[in-house]
């Protein structure tokens, strides 16, 4: 592994800021995945698009409508420090953990994704790319 690969967070390297595991066929996937565990996308917008599609499914299909419910499923405690994850997302979005979310509320959904990506990758994403990914979803 080269030095750059060790410095750049995996989710950023893979254009997959929420670290979606391999499993679905996504628009914008790379032709050959070299990661083996997490999806890789041809651009950050496609990775963001996939994340928004999953978040929309969580809200509409699974009826997970709060930050706490969404993150509890997204980042189970078995693999993550769940309370810390939720606390950081709440702090960065300015929303309480039990606030009801609507997928149609673009600014809130974009803030949610940005906060989750910050927890997952430790970096702030480009707001324009987040909005573009939301519109692509």
Residue ranges and their predicted role:
Residues 1-137:
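Cell-wall polysaccharide-cleaving catalytic domain and substrate-binding groove, primarily
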């Amino acid at each position: 592994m080269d030095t750059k690969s060790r410095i750049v967070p995996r989710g950023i390297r893979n254009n997959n800021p929420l670290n979606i595991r391999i499993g679905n066929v996504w628009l914008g996937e790379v032709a050959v995945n070299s990661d083996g565990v997490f999806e890789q996308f041809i651009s950050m917008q496609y990775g963001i698009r996939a994340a928004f599609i999953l978040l929309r499914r969580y809200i509409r299909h699974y009826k997970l409508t709060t930050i706490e419910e969404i993150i509890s499923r997204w980042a189970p405690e078995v693999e993550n420090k769940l309370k810390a994850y939720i606390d950081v997302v709440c702090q960065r979005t300015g929303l309480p953990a039990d606030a009801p979310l609507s997928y149609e509320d673009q600014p809130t959904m974009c803030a949610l994704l940005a906060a989750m990506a910050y927890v997952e990758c430790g970096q702030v994403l480009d707001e324009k790319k987040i909005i573009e990914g939301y519109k692509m979803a």
